[in-house]
Amino acid sequence: MQRSDPPRPLLEMRGISKTFPAVRALAGVSLTVHPGEVHSLMGENGAGKSTLMKILSGAYQADPGGEILIDGRPISIDGPLAARDAGVAVIYQELCLAPNLSVAENIHVGRELRRGNGRRGTIDRAAMARGCQDVLERLGADFGPNTLVGTLSIAEQQLVEIARAVHTRARILVMDEPTTPLSSRETDNLFRLIRQLRAEGLAIIYISHRMAEIYELSDRVSVLRDGAYVGTLERDALSAERLVGMMVGRDISGFYKKAHAPYDPGNLLLSVRDIADGARVRGCSLDLHAGEVLGIAGLVGAGRTELARLIFGAEPRVRGEVTLAGKAFAAHSPREAIDAGLVYLTEDRKRQGLFLDMSVRENINISVCGRDARLGALDLARGAQRARDAIAALSIRVPHANVNVGALSGGNQQKVLLSRLLETKPRVLILDEPTRGVDIGAKSEIYRIINELARAGVGVIVISSELPEIIGVADRVLVMREGRIAGELGGRTDAPITQEAIIALATGSRTEASAAH
């Protein structure tokens, strides 16, 4: 049987370089994408993925010497309009929609239909609504073209962006971390839509740090590292070890390895009994031992974050008792909890954790700056040294400590926030989605820090939606469902910590708890 030739590439980016003042962001990168393909693009933050896609979208101009070809023909993409005309559409993490306009108006933005005299005519909103109705139906939208975008959920707004791309007859669709704000069900719906678009012949460039998504969707995966092209793997050659090794340039066989000694079940550090908030948390109990990493898993909305905030004192509790190091503990504010040695890393670092318009040095020192007071004045030199030490200890990639946190990658922002918490010398550390939105290299550093803290006797609670992460770092796992502890895995129980067991408890398909909680 004669093998058919592979399809001609739809997109070829050859020898693309980009230099910013004092920084070479891309060095001769090439990428080839075929029609009807999901081609994933991976790399650590700062590897050059976003820069390469911004060149494709016309937001940046490449240095002289490279070229972009579509259907084998060289083209010039000198701006976003040229990219759109070439059939390129990009859906960024921060959706580019006008909330006060309708779905139809957002889909037609920049291409409004008008009555009468060309661009001077009045906008024909009825015609625009009719023009995009078929696209919305084709994509399975359950809202109409006249719906105000501001009333839609994030997942629905994302669908509007996809509808706009389809309506402009885009042939190349770039999706940058599209599942970050989505629930599990919304993610499943997005994947169904991606497969539909692939079957219709679109080329989809998919950027994600989540290995499970890469395995599920990708036909091929290309990896960038430090602004250079490393290689491309076919679907049947994918493995976590190969991909991560290509991304970070080193062996990661111990990526999730527990590098701390088994905890002492007789050394109880934190005890929580029947804690509730009257709404999302309905009577939860747990124990945490010195040197233990306790995982908390569950579906979105199960009450994991609410439980953490109750323990931390960020939300009032209606009942329940908490004991810390053998003493009754009832924090009425986060400050009281921090002073007692219990700290919490929020799942939303940008809104609730960091001061984005302040420097790395200021963010690291803000919780402990009172230690540096001398006769009413701050010892700035001491604070600066503390920041330098933290930057070195957590491998924070930053040119200097005075750069604004808002300018850093997600992984480095997370390490700055973690540094601030560690400066308080905690006995108990609660980490809520500690690696969300960070690259593989930063994840590895965060896992290393968790192990070091456990070795030092700190009790660590890790809340995560990534099951491989929970399984890899935790000594025991508690699974929440509908505001309660549904069961325990690992530890003193005979129940192994597996994805299947976690999902069964989280969904209620397995109702027996392995321990009474």
Curated annotation (Swiss-Prot):
One Gene Ontology molecular-function label: ATP binding
One cellular component term from this protein's GO annotations in UniProt: plasma membrane
Binding positions for ATP per the UniProt entry: G43, E44, N45, G46, A47, G48, K49, S50
Enzyme class: translocase
Membrane topology designation: Peripheral membrane protein
Locations listed in the record: Cell inner membrane
Pfam families attached to this UniProt entry: ABC_tran
ABC transporter domain boundaries: 11-251, 263-507
Catalytic activity reported: D-ribose(out) + ATP + H2O = D-ribose(in) + ADP + phosphate + H(+)
UniProt entry keywords in alphabetical sequence: ATP-binding, Cell inner membrane, Cell membrane, Membrane, Nucleotide-binding, Repeat, Sugar transport, Translocase, Transport
Superkingdom of origin organism: Bacteria
Principal place of residence: membrane
Gene3D superfamilies: P-loop containing nucleotide triphosphate hydrolases
Enzyme Commission number: 7.5.2.7
Function according to Swiss-Prot or TrEMBL: Part of the ABC transporter complex RbsABC involved in ribose import. Responsible for energy coupling to the transport system.
Subunit structure as annotated in this protein's UniProt entry: The complex is composed of an ATP-binding protein (RbsA), two transmembrane proteins (RbsC) and a solute-binding protein (RbsB).
Family affiliation: Belongs to the ABC transporter superfamily. Ribose importer (TC 3.A.1.2.1) family.
Protein name listed in UniProt: Ribose import ATP-binding protein RbsA
Lineage of the organism: Bacteria, Pseudomonadati, Pseudomonadota, Betaproteobacteria, Burkholderiales
Gene, per the UniProt record: rbsA
